[in-house]
Swiss-Prot record:
This is Arginine--tRNA ligase 2. Monomer. It catalyses: tRNA(Arg) + L-arginine + ATP = L-arginyl-tRNA(Arg) + AMP + diphosphate. Keywords: Aminoacyl-tRNA synthetase, ATP-binding, Cytoplasm, Ligase, Nucleotide-binding, Protein biosynthesis. Pfam families: Arg_tRNA_synt_N, DALR_1, tRNA-synt_1d. It comes from Halalkalibacterium halodurans (strain ATCC BAA-125 / DSM 18197 / FERM 7344 / JCM 9153 / C-125) (Bacillus halodurans). NCBIfam families: argS. GO terms for molecular function: arginine-tRNA ligase activity; ATP binding. Its EC number is 6.1.1.19. A motif ('HIGH' region) lies at residues 117-127. It is an enzyme of class 6 (ligase). It is found in: Cytoplasm.
Length: 561
């Protein structure tokens, strides 16, 4: 709010672009030096003036300003906000949509490829990151004026289904498919790979079954349909628990009839070459290995389907930006796909983004399906919720909503524990750390919110904030909290544009920390009504920001813990 106003004013005075000014603005190391500082040293050469002289000129330009005082100190201009005026303006602004939904997207359609688990495999904890990062990005984009749609691009096609069918035909009678189909599918898949190490002909058998599937073989199609149906039932249970929804659930198979036209287009544009019986697009111009389009046995490959998918999302779903929330191990693949789209002449290929993320480890261990070492997300959630329930019950043995709150805290701890990290980094999930009610955790933020709601229940009915005496919330910890609340719209925009939900998670941790410092320094329910009302309004607005930010991240905020 105020930082933007100062940026705009400085940009106008100095004939600079606003983003240039924003990059130069600093937060002083001590509050006695002001709320914002602008260094003038980089301007000395272009303005042909000494930095202290530029600073003095800028101080004079802000003399008549009602909301801020500028003071030149050496080569810096330090800005001091008029605190009570700022507090009043902030609380008024918080009544407007612009605070809660700052529009930077102008209705642009963004298609988000997210979650995308593989059919016939369990919903392992390894699927969590794409699901919740994509979910948070959807809400960030929606908040900031974009028109996002969520697509679950199910892994329901590929040679692995030939292997799955071959395994089912050989050993399907050895597993309990009715009682637990997904676990049985995994058992069959693991057995196939163990047996294939002893008998290489099994790999050929798997390839042959996939070729039959692509050619419309009745038995192959029947089994594939069965695998898809049972898997979707399993996935939906997990999505309901995570609070995640989709606008479209379209597996790779949806694009089967669109791949031949893509191959034809590549041929017509002279982009395909033959390499050892396979068709590839050379990418030496981008310093990338060739992109495989059709394998030597005539079957399609991931890149073919992703090219067809991208074209569909742009032409049919009207995506102006296409986001792919997929792990970092697919970086080369997406570089190849995006560059092939460019070579095909699609200018919008520049609007395709790979939203990469690191591995999720459970106590330092990576997950794998091929060998069966997959950690089920449901097992992790059940374990975390059980521990959360025990912690809550210890403090509140007769909690009226114990199960509901434990679910919110447990699932929220898992989601927040992931999203608070830079998505590009590996995440090592440790249950005890994630569930702590102290430190940088989801439960800490939820506890802060519940504390605020408890205070508000004990307080008075709040008066019209326009007539408040804000001096009671603009000193020390109160001012520190207010300055953080001012930043919320800007944080939403920056987290969205950077595709970094962790910026919002870190922000809500800061809000919680600043509020708790304020809470421990001042009596909110003071005897003096004027003091009490001002502090209650600050508490209420803080709670609103916490709840709103956590909802964007996909974490619930119970009223009581």
């Amino acid at each position: 709010m105020l930082a933007q106003m100062i940026s705009e004013e400085l940009a106008r005075i100095l004939s600079l672009k606003e983003d240039e000014v924003e990059r130069l603005l600093e937060i002083p190391p001590q509050e006695t030096l002001g709320d914002l500082a602008f260094p003038c040293f980089t301007l000395a050469k272009t303005k042909r003036k000494a930095p202290p002289f530029i600073a003095a000129e800028l101080e004079a330009a802000f003399l008549e300003h009602k909301e801020v005082t500028a003071k030149a100190t050496g080569g810096y201009v330090n800005f001091f906000f008029h605190r009570e005026t700022v507090a009043g303006q902030l609380f008024q602004e918080m009544k407007s949509n612009q605070y809660w939904q700052p529009n930077s997207g102008d209705g642009k359609r963004v298609v988000i490829d997210m979650s995308s688990p593989n059919i016939a495999k369990p919903f392992g904890i390894g699927h969590l990151r794409s699901t919740i990062i994509g979910h948070a990005l959807y809400h960030l984009l929606k908040k900031t004026g974009y028109d996002p749609i969520r697509v679950n691009h199910l892994g329901d096609w590929g040679t692995q289904f030939g292997k799955q069918i071959a395994a089912y035909q050989r050993w399907g009678g050895d597993v309990d498919l009715k009682q637990n189909p997904i676990a049985s599918f995994l058992e069959l898949y693991v057995r196939f790979h163990e047996e294939a190490e002893k008998d290489e002909s099994l790999e050929d058998e798997g390839r042959e079954w996939f070729k039959k599937l692509e050619e419309g073989d009745e038995e192959a199609d029947r089994l594939w349909t069965y695998f898809v149906k049972e898997s979707l039932n399993e996935f939906d249970r997990m999505y309901n628990r995570l609070g995640v929804e989709f606008d479209y659930v379209l597996g790779e198979s949806f694009y089967n009839d669109q791949m031949a036209p893509v191959v034809k287009e590549l041929q017509e544009k002279g982009l395909l070459t033959c390499s050892e019986g396979a068709l590839v697009v050379p990418l030496e111009d981008a310093d990338l290995p060739p992109c495989l389009i059709v394998k030597s046995d005539g079957t399609s490959i991931y890149a073919t389907r992703d090219l067809a998918t991208a074209i569909y999302r742009h032409h049919v779903q009207k995506g102006e930006k296409l986001l792919y929330v997929v792990g970092g191990e697919q970086t080369l693949h997406f570089k190849q796909v995006f560059h092939v789209l460019k070579k095909m002449g699609y200018k919008w290929a520049d609007q395709c983004e790979h939203i990469t993320f690191g591995l999720l480890r459970l106590d330092g261990k990576k997950m794998s399906t091929r060998r069966g070492r997959v950690v089920m997300l449901e097992d992790v959630l059940n374990d975390v919720v059980a521990h959360a329930k025990a912690k809550i019950k210890e403090k509140h043995p007769n909690h009226p909503h114990l199960h509901e709150v434990a679910e919110a805290v447990g699932v929220g701890a898992v989601i927040f524990g992931d999203l608070k990290q830079d998505r590009r980094l590996d995440v090592n999930f440790r249950l005890e750390d994630a569930l702590s009610f102290e430190g940088e955790t989801g439960p800490y933020v939820q506890y802060t919110y519940a504390r605020i709601q408890s205070i508000l229940r004990k307080g008075d009915k709040l008066n019209d904030s326009r007539h408040m005496d804000w001096q009671h919330v603009t000193k020390d910890e109160g001012w520190s909290l207010l300055k953080v609340l001012i930043q919320y719209p800007n944080v939403l925009i920056k987290a969205t544009e950077a595709r970094e939900p962790h910026q919002l998670a870190r922000y809500v941790l800061t809000v919680s920390k600043k509020f708790n410092q304020f809470y421990h320094k001042y009596v909110i329910l003071a005897d003096d009504e004027t003091v009490r009302q001002a502090r209650l309004i600050l508490a209420e607005r803080t709670g609103e920001v916490i709840a709103d930010a956590m909802a964007v991240l996909g974490v619930k905020t119970p009223e009581e813990l």
